[in-house]
Amino acid sequence: MANVKLFDQTGKEVSSVELNDAVFGIEPNESVVFDVVISQRASLRQGTHAVKNRSAVSGGGRKPWRQKGTGRARQGSIRSPQWRGGGVVFGPTPRSYGYKLPQKVRRLALKSVYSAKVAEDKFVAVEGLSFAAPKTAEFAKVLSALSIDTKVLVLVEEGNEFAALSARNLPNVTVATAATASVLDIVNADKLLVTKEAISTIEEVLA
Protein backbone atom coordinates (compact mmCIF):
# COMPACT_ATOMS: atom_id res chain seq x y z
CA MET A 1 0.00 0.00 0.00
CA ALA A 2 1.15 3.52 -0.81
CA ASN A 3 2.06 5.89 2.00
CA VAL A 4 1.70 9.65 1.80
CA LYS A 5 2.93 12.23 4.28
CA LEU A 6 0.34 13.69 6.65
CA PHE A 7 0.64 17.39 7.49
CA ASP A 8 -1.10 19.61 10.00
CA GLN A 9 -2.53 23.06 9.21
CA THR A 10 0.81 24.73 9.90
CA GLY A 11 2.55 22.65 7.22
CA LYS A 12 4.39 20.45 9.72
CA GLU A 13 4.69 16.75 8.89
CA VAL A 14 3.05 14.82 11.74
CA SER A 15 2.90 11.24 10.41
CA SER A 16 1.92 9.31 7.30
CA VAL A 17 -1.26 7.79 5.90
CA GLU A 18 -1.52 4.37 4.30
CA LEU A 19 -3.69 4.50 1.18
CA ASN A 20 -5.78 1.60 -0.08
CA ASP A 21 -4.25 0.35 -3.34
CA ALA A 22 -7.69 -0.69 -4.62
CA VAL A 23 -8.62 3.01 -4.73
CA PHE A 24 -5.37 4.98 -4.90
CA GLY A 25 -2.99 2.50 -6.51
CA ILE A 26 -4.61 1.18 -9.69
CA GLU A 27 -3.38 1.61 -13.25
CA PRO A 28 -5.30 4.69 -14.51
CA ASN A 29 -7.70 3.94 -17.36
CA GLU A 30 -7.47 7.06 -19.53
CA SER A 31 -10.21 6.04 -21.93
CA VAL A 32 -12.74 5.62 -19.10
CA VAL A 33 -11.70 8.97 -17.58
CA PHE A 34 -12.18 10.60 -20.99
CA ASP A 35 -15.69 9.13 -21.35
CA VAL A 36 -16.74 10.31 -17.88
CA VAL A 37 -15.33 13.83 -18.38
CA ILE A 38 -17.22 14.17 -21.68
CA SER A 39 -20.41 12.94 -19.96
CA GLN A 40 -20.05 15.41 -17.07
CA ARG A 41 -19.25 18.31 -19.38
CA ALA A 42 -22.32 17.45 -21.47
CA SER A 43 -24.47 17.56 -18.32
CA LEU A 44 -23.24 21.10 -17.62
CA ARG A 45 -24.56 22.43 -20.94
CA GLN A 46 -27.51 24.77 -20.49
CA GLY A 47 -29.56 23.47 -23.41
CA THR A 48 -32.01 26.40 -23.43
CA HIS A 49 -31.50 27.25 -27.11
CA ALA A 50 -34.74 27.69 -29.06
CA VAL A 51 -36.05 29.12 -32.32
CA LYS A 52 -39.59 29.65 -33.62
CA ASN A 53 -40.98 27.37 -36.29
CA ARG A 54 -43.74 28.49 -38.65
CA SER A 55 -46.46 27.67 -36.12
CA ALA A 56 -44.81 29.77 -33.39
CA VAL A 57 -44.04 32.92 -35.44
CA SER A 58 -46.64 35.64 -35.02
CA GLY A 59 -48.86 36.36 -38.05
CA GLY A 60 -49.25 34.55 -41.33
CA GLY A 61 -52.75 33.22 -40.76
CA ARG A 62 -54.15 34.65 -43.99
CA LYS A 63 -53.17 33.44 -47.45
CA PRO A 64 -51.13 36.33 -48.95
CA TRP A 65 -52.86 36.11 -52.37
CA ARG A 66 -55.29 33.81 -54.08
CA GLN A 67 -54.13 30.44 -55.30
CA LYS A 68 -54.62 30.96 -59.04
CA GLY A 69 -54.72 33.74 -61.57
CA THR A 70 -52.03 36.15 -60.31
CA GLY A 71 -49.11 34.65 -62.22
CA ARG A 72 -47.11 34.41 -59.01
CA ALA A 73 -46.01 31.26 -57.22
CA ARG A 74 -48.63 29.87 -54.88
CA GLN A 75 -48.14 30.79 -51.22
CA GLY A 76 -50.10 29.79 -48.15
CA SER A 77 -48.53 31.98 -45.45
CA ILE A 78 -46.07 34.85 -45.10
CA ARG A 79 -44.50 32.90 -42.22
CA SER A 80 -43.37 29.97 -44.37
CA PRO A 81 -39.61 29.25 -44.04
CA GLN A 82 -38.76 30.77 -47.43
CA TRP A 83 -40.16 34.19 -46.42
CA ARG A 84 -38.18 36.87 -44.63
CA GLY A 85 -39.38 36.74 -41.02
CA GLY A 86 -40.73 33.23 -41.52
CA GLY A 87 -40.28 30.24 -39.25
CA VAL A 88 -37.07 28.21 -38.98
CA VAL A 89 -37.00 24.64 -40.27
CA PHE A 90 -35.53 21.96 -37.97
CA GLY A 91 -34.02 24.57 -35.64
CA PRO A 92 -32.73 23.82 -32.13
CA THR A 93 -35.23 23.23 -29.33
CA PRO A 94 -34.63 23.17 -25.56
CA ARG A 95 -33.13 19.84 -24.53
CA SER A 96 -30.86 18.21 -21.97
CA TYR A 97 -27.48 17.10 -23.25
CA GLY A 98 -26.81 14.97 -20.18
CA TYR A 99 -26.47 11.22 -20.31
CA LYS A 100 -25.52 8.69 -17.67
CA LEU A 101 -22.75 6.15 -17.76
CA PRO A 102 -22.86 2.89 -15.78
CA GLN A 103 -21.92 3.20 -12.11
CA LYS A 104 -18.98 0.79 -12.55
CA VAL A 105 -17.53 3.08 -15.22
CA ARG A 106 -17.91 6.18 -13.04
CA ARG A 107 -16.30 4.44 -10.06
CA LEU A 108 -13.38 3.21 -12.18
CA ALA A 109 -12.85 6.75 -13.48
CA LEU A 110 -12.73 8.13 -9.92
CA LYS A 111 -10.21 5.48 -8.86
CA SER A 112 -8.15 6.24 -11.97
CA VAL A 113 -7.92 9.99 -11.34
CA TYR A 114 -7.17 9.53 -7.62
CA SER A 115 -4.44 6.99 -8.47
CA ALA A 116 -2.97 9.33 -11.09
CA LYS A 117 -2.76 12.22 -8.59
CA VAL A 118 -1.01 9.99 -6.03
CA ALA A 119 1.42 8.64 -8.65
CA GLU A 120 2.23 12.17 -9.86
CA ASP A 121 2.84 13.36 -6.27
CA LYS A 122 -0.04 15.83 -6.53
CA PHE A 123 -1.93 14.43 -3.54
CA VAL A 124 -1.47 16.30 -0.24
CA ALA A 125 -2.95 14.80 2.94
CA VAL A 126 -3.76 17.05 5.88
CA GLU A 127 -4.78 15.99 9.39
CA GLY A 128 -7.80 18.28 9.36
CA LEU A 129 -9.06 21.69 8.31
CA SER A 130 -10.77 23.25 11.30
CA PHE A 131 -11.57 26.94 11.63
CA ALA A 132 -13.28 28.75 14.51
CA ALA A 133 -15.10 30.93 11.97
CA PRO A 134 -15.07 31.44 8.19
CA LYS A 135 -11.81 33.34 7.53
CA THR A 136 -10.33 33.58 4.05
CA ALA A 137 -6.97 34.76 5.43
CA GLU A 138 -6.72 31.67 7.66
CA PHE A 139 -7.31 29.33 4.73
CA ALA A 140 -4.76 31.24 2.64
CA LYS A 141 -2.22 30.71 5.46
CA VAL A 142 -2.83 26.95 5.35
CA LEU A 143 -2.23 26.83 1.59
CA SER A 144 0.92 28.91 1.97
CA ALA A 145 2.23 26.66 4.76
CA LEU A 146 1.68 23.61 2.55
CA SER A 147 3.38 25.34 -0.43
CA ILE A 148 0.25 25.09 -2.58
CA ASP A 149 0.14 27.93 -5.10
CA THR A 150 -1.59 26.25 -8.06
CA LYS A 151 -5.17 25.29 -8.85
CA VAL A 152 -6.25 23.05 -5.98
CA LEU A 153 -9.28 20.93 -5.14
CA VAL A 154 -9.83 20.66 -1.39
CA LEU A 155 -11.70 17.56 -0.26
CA VAL A 156 -13.20 17.77 3.23
CA GLU A 157 -15.50 15.65 5.33
CA GLU A 158 -19.27 16.18 5.34
CA GLY A 159 -20.37 19.09 7.54
CA ASN A 160 -17.15 21.13 7.43
CA GLU A 161 -18.90 24.32 6.31
CA PHE A 162 -16.30 26.74 7.66
CA ALA A 163 -13.63 25.32 5.34
CA ALA A 164 -15.87 25.81 2.29
CA LEU A 165 -16.83 29.35 3.36
CA SER A 166 -13.21 30.27 4.11
CA ALA A 167 -12.03 29.19 0.66
CA ARG A 168 -14.80 30.51 -1.57
CA ASN A 169 -13.14 33.90 -2.19
CA LEU A 170 -9.73 32.44 -2.99
CA PRO A 171 -8.84 32.18 -6.69
CA ASN A 172 -8.02 28.71 -8.04
CA VAL A 173 -9.42 26.98 -4.93
CA THR A 174 -12.43 24.66 -5.08
CA VAL A 175 -13.87 22.88 -2.05
CA ALA A 176 -15.96 19.71 -2.25
CA THR A 177 -16.86 16.88 0.08
CA ALA A 178 -15.24 13.51 -0.44
CA ALA A 179 -18.57 12.00 -1.45
CA THR A 180 -19.51 14.65 -4.03
CA ALA A 181 -16.21 15.32 -5.83
CA SER A 182 -16.52 14.60 -9.54
CA VAL A 183 -13.97 13.27 -12.01
CA LEU A 184 -14.13 16.62 -13.82
CA ASP A 185 -13.29 18.51 -10.59
CA ILE A 186 -10.28 16.27 -9.94
CA VAL A 187 -8.99 16.40 -13.53
CA ASN A 188 -9.24 20.21 -13.55
CA ALA A 189 -7.17 20.57 -10.38
CA ASP A 190 -3.37 20.66 -10.39
CA LYS A 191 -3.28 19.35 -6.82
CA LEU A 192 -5.59 17.64 -4.33
CA LEU A 193 -5.63 18.69 -0.67
CA VAL A 194 -7.47 15.97 1.24
CA THR A 195 -8.28 15.69 4.94
CA LYS A 196 -7.66 12.41 6.77
CA GLU A 197 -11.39 11.92 7.32
CA ALA A 198 -12.08 12.54 3.63
CA ILE A 199 -9.56 9.84 2.67
CA SER A 200 -11.45 7.36 4.87
CA THR A 201 -14.74 8.37 3.21
CA ILE A 202 -13.29 7.93 -0.30
CA GLU A 203 -11.99 4.47 0.60
CA GLU A 204 -15.34 3.49 2.12
CA VAL A 205 -17.23 4.55 -1.00
CA LEU A 206 -14.87 3.20 -3.67
CA ALA A 207 -13.04 0.22 -2.14
From Swiss-Prot:
| PANTHER family given in the database record | 50S RIBOSOMAL PROTEIN L4, LARGE RIBOSOMAL SUBUNIT PROTEIN UL4M
**An annotated Gene Ontology molecular function:** rRNA binding
**InterPro entries recorded:** Ribosomal_uL4, Ribosomal_uL4-like, Ribosomal_uL4_dom_sf
Protein name, please?
Large ribosomal subunit protein uL4
GO cellular-component term (any): ribosome
Assembly and partners?
Answer: Part of the 50S ribosomal subunit.
Which residue ranges run through the membrane? none
Q: Which gene encodes it?
A: rplD
Q: Which UniProt keywords apply?
A: Ribonucleoprotein, Ribosomal protein, RNA-binding, rRNA-binding
The UniProt entry, under Gene3D superfamilies, shows: 3.40.1370.10
Described function? One of the primary rRNA binding proteins, this protein initially binds near the 5'-end of the 23S rRNA. It is important during the early stages of 50S assembly. It makes multiple contacts with different domains of the 23S rRNA in the assembled 50S subunit and ribosome. Forms part of the polypeptide exit tunnel.
GO BP annotations of the record are:
translation
Identify its protein family. Belongs to the universal ribosomal protein uL4 family.
Please list where the region (Disordered) is annotated: 49-78
